[in-house]
């Protein structure tokens, strides 16, 4: 270019010849060898870019240094000339004339704008510094990640290189071991001219630009044979040439040459990176018989467009080699967490461990136990096997399905006060239900059969002063209802012991005291019937001292209140004492959780189905909840209060009737709400299974010990009175069964074929017919079809409303099965004076009656020398050849015995009568 440019000369000078870039392509020809002596000449083109001196691979990017944001540059100078500001704050123009004076507002606005600008400047600077710091951290993390990836890549390449080296050594060793014919000859000293490929750089920085096209091309395999070096039927042990070499990379450009037998071959790169000289071309010679074996014919070789496919035999040999390597490789042991129940079969245990059942059985055999895969082993043995095989064990039990149902600890911050639960207990006819009626302003006594309580009931009463609700549970006082009283004491907070002032402490009063002590709940004594003229409350307090109940008036800590249910005297004070005791107990619970409760009573209602009276103790029971109680489950269809109102939910200490069970649960079962039906089915199936196992164990256990065998021998001849019992509620049925069980003796006992809740059905009649049993209905009736079937088959059905009438009738019927008692009544004695032998009659003894009377047909004993030699009946009694009915003392008569004639003079005959006396239980 000239030193000076002419402004008007803009013409571009173009040389006479167009400039072009010469393609840097290196070409050459190589000969590619194929199995079975075939070869092909190909042309290889190598394209790439030349490296300039000083070029190098770009260095890895470095994280920039954290930059500190600089303050923005000052604003450009104003076009107006800047002059000194006048002292008066006036701005002057170019001529020095004051244009306008700034007001105070404008000056304050300008100062505020400057302050805001400084704040923004500081904020932007801080954000820039934060962004620079984050960018530096991010780039440092990326750099560390790249370095780790590069290290992994290098390790992977090194591993692949070692694997290829080991594989190549193994193939060479196999070639030496299994090769046939002469050894390969050394390569010629003067190799054929080939296209020399540049050696591969060790690392990426030495690689030229355009790396994908600049790698050395590998056409032949590393073990390409020199001419005639391999036997006719042998193949090289290295990789096949058609695969592009061991690295599996295709050549940059391969074109088939016109002549397949001429031309040089490419230099092959070894695993270490150094170039090896290509072997000399194959020499053409006449193949011998061994060279010809296993090769293609000339026509097939000339007509083939591609290399020959792999033979089946070669594929099989390779498969066998791979199988051998796989067998030699030790598999990694899989350690599993094995869940072991209480009992498990060997096959199932092996499946859970992913082991062979044969190995498990072999392990058991080493321990001296012979088993089959279908045998059941216990959890301890299964745990030993699993740990021996290197697995971890998780022991589970069938009872785990009940975990989390009850007694879940609540957070103290979620609790709130609840109403107290009070159980009223006492002896029969001491006024428990009447006292509750007076508190509830109701009349339950008139609804009970016989005026006695035979059901457990739960009610809620509101205290008049505080307005708090108190839940009362009324229990029967009769001896037959012990289980009911015990159940009431378990779910209660306070026990109110009702004692009649005119009757004092009675047996069921003592039992109620024991129940309260066993439940460890406080007690309040209500001395009832103080309105009677013969009431003596002081005697009641004194009698309670004998049973370790010391009231406050006698220096104790038990509260006592004198009340009258008839006149409603001191009822307010009784409620006040109950509320005071509840405040002392500080009763709290969590209502915002799934409900828990206790089944107080259960029955089978004909119109509503199974109905259970439930006392909710924790949480809230809602309509639609899935509930479990004992071996029964269901979904809550309705909640009915003690007043008959339908509720949507019931909180703690609220008694409700629950509808929706599949069957009536047993009284005393705990109720819980579960999350779904699947969990409910698991719990109920487990409990039903436990109940069946317990029943089977009780039956099989009766044959266990020697004492049980002796008791069975005693009861082997015991008579049984079969019964089918149906009751209205579970509690009454429980009381009936307990009372009938007490009636049994060693000679006779009641056999309960079936006991259930609900009306009498046809199936009950059919069952009773099969065992010739009686049917008893307590507060229930048989339906029309069952009554007709019982009448047709002669099955007796008896109905009762009072439990004592039922027990008395069954007792009388069972007494009829007892064997009667035989009692002897002495009539008289006679002495034999002479023995006569009469032809048609036999021997007849002539006797004199010494005392009493001898009657014909009475029982006699023949005594000889104070030893009884015969017992029988008197068949003939005559006096002077006349048959007489009896003979008095001092008279003589003739006697003959039935089927006996060995009578001697001097023998004594005792005459007695046997009386049959009917026994009773």
Curated annotation (Swiss-Prot):
Residues 451-455 are annotated as: G2. CDD domains: IF2_eIF5B, IF2_mtIF2_II, mtIF2_IVc. It comes from the Bacteria. One of its GO terms (cellular component) is cytosol. Residues 117-183 have a biased composition (Basic and acidic residues). The keyword Coiled coil does not apply. It is found in: Cytoplasm. It holds the Pfam family EF-G_D2. Residues 417-586 form the tr-type G domain. Its main location: cytoplasm. Residues 426-433 are annotated as: G1. Residues 1-296 are annotated as: Disordered. Residues 528-531 are annotated as: G4. Belongs to the TRAFAC class translation factor GTPase superfamily. Classic translation factor GTPase family. IF-2 subfamily. One of the essential components for the initiation of protein synthesis. Protects formylmethionyl-tRNA from spontaneous hydrolysis and promotes its binding to the 30S ribosomal subunits. Also involved in the hydrolysis of GTP during the formation of the 70S ribosomal complex. HAMAP family: IF_2_B. This is Translation initiation factor IF-2. It comes from Bradyrhizobium sp. (strain ORS 278). The gene is infB.
């Amino acid at each position: 270019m000239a030193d000076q440019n002419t402004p008007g000369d803009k013409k571009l000078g173009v040389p006479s010849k167009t400039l072009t870039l010469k393609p840097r392509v290196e070409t050459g020809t190589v000969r590619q060898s194929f199995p079975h002596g075939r070869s092909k000449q190909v042309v290889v083109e190598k394209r790439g870019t030349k490296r300039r001196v000083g070029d190098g691979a770009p260095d890895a990017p470095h994280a920039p240094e954290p930059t500190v944001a600089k303050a923005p540059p000052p604003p450009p100078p104003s076009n107006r000339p800047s002059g000194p500001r006048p002292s008066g704050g006036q701005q002057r123009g170019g001529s020095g004339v004051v244009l306008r004076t700034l007001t105070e507002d404008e000056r304050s606005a300008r100062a505020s704008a400057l302050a805001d600008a400084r704040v923004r400047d500081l904020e932007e600077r801080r954000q820039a510094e934060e962004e620079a710091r984050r960018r530096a951290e991010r780039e440092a993390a990326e750099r560390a990640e790249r370095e780790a990836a590069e290290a992994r890549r290098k390790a992977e390449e090194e591993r692949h290189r070692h694997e290829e080296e080991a594989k190549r050594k193994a193939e060479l060793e196999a070639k030496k071991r299994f090769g046939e014919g002469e050894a390969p000859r050394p390569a010629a000293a003067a190799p054929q001219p080939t296209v020399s490929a540049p050696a591969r750089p060790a690392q990426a920085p030495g690689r030229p630009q355009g790396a994908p096209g600049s790698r050395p091309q590998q056409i032949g395999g590393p073990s390409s044979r020199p001419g005639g070096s391999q036997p006719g039927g042998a193949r090289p042990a290295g990789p096949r040439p058609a695969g592009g070499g061991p690295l599996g990379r295709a050549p940059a450009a391969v074109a088939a040459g016109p002549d397949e037998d001429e031309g040089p071959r490419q230099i092959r790169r070894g695993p270490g990176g150094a170039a090896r000289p290509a072997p000399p071309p194959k020499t053409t010679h006449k193949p011998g018989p061994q060279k010809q074996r296993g090769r293609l014919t000339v026509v097939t070789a000339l007509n083939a467009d591609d290399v020959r496919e792999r033979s089946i035999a070669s594929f099989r040999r390779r498969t066998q080699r791979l199988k051998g390597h796989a067998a030699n490789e030790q598999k990694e042991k899989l350690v599993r967490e094995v869940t072991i129940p209480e009992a498990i079969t060997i096959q199932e245990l092996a499946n859970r461990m992913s082991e062979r059942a044969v190995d498990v059985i072999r392990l058991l055999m080493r321990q001296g136990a012979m088993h089959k895969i279908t045998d059941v082993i216990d959890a301890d043995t299964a745990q030993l096997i699993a740990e021996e095989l290197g697995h971890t064990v998780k022991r589970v039990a069938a009872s785990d399905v009940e975990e989390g149902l009850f007694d879940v600890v609540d957070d103290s911050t979620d609790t709130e006060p609840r109403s107290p639960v009070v159980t009223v207990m006492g002896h029969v006819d001491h006024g428990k239900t009447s006292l509750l009626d007076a508190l509830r302003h109701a009349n339950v006594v008139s609804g009970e059969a016989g005026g006695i309580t035979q059901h457990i009931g739960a009610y809620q009463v509101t205290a008049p002063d505080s307005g708090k609700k108190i839940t009362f549970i009324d229990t029967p006082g009769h001896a037959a209802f012990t289980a009911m009283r015990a159940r009431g004491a378990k779910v209660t907070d306070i026990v109110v012991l009702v004692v009649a002032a005119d009757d004092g402490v009675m047996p069921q009063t003592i039992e109620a005291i024991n129940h309260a002590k066993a439940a460890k709940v406080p007690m309040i004594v209500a001395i009832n019937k103080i309105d009677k003229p013969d009431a003596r409350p002081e005697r009641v307090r004194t009698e309670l001292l004998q049973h370790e109940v010391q009231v406050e008036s006698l220096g104790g800590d038990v509260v006592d209140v004198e009340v009258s249910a008839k006149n409603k005297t001191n009822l307010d004070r009784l409620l006040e004492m109950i509320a005071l005791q509840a405040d002392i107990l500080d009763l709290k619970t969590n209502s915002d959780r799934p409900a828990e409760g206790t089944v107080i009573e259960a029955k089978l209602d004909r119109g509503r189905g199974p109905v259970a009276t439930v006392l909710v103790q924790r949480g809230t029971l809602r309509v639609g909840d899935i509930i479990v109680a004992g071996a029964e489950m269901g979904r809550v269809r309705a909640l009915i209060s003690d007043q008959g109102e339908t509720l949507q939910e019931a909180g703690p200490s609220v008694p409700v009737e629950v509808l929706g069970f599949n069957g009536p649960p047993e009284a005393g079962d705990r109720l819980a709400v579960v999350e779904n039906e699947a969990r409910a089915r698991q719990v109920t199936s487990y409990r039903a299974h436990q109940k069946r196992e317990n029943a089977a164990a009780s039956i099989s256990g009766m044959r266990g010990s020697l004492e049980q065998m002796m008791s069975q021998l005693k009861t082997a001849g015991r008579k049984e009175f079969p019964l089918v019992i149906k009751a209205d509620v579970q509690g009454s049925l429980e009381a009936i069964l307990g009372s009938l069980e007490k009636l049994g003796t060693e000679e006779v006992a009641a056999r309960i074929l079936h006991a259930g809740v609900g009306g009498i059905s046809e199936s009950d009649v059919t069952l009773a017919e099969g065992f010739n049993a009686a049917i008893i209905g307590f507060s229930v009736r048989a339906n029309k079809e069952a009554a007709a079937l019982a009448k047709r088959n002669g099955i007796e059905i008896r109905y009762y409303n009072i439990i004592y009438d039922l027990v008395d009738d069954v007792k009388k019927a069972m007494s009829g099965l007892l064997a009667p008692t035989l009692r002897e009544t002495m009539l008289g004695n006679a002495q034999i004076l002479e023995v006569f032998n009469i032809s048609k009659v036999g021997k007849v003894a002539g006797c004199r009656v010494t005392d009493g009377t001898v009657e014909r047909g009475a029982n006699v004993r023949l005594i000889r020398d104070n030893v009884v030699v015969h017992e029988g009946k008197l068949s003939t009694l005559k006096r002077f050849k006349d048959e007489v009915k009896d003979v008095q003392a001092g008279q003589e008569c003739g006697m003959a015995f039935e089927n006996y004639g060995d009578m001697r003079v001097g023998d004594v005959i005792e005459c007695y009568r046997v009386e049959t006396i009917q026994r009773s239980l």
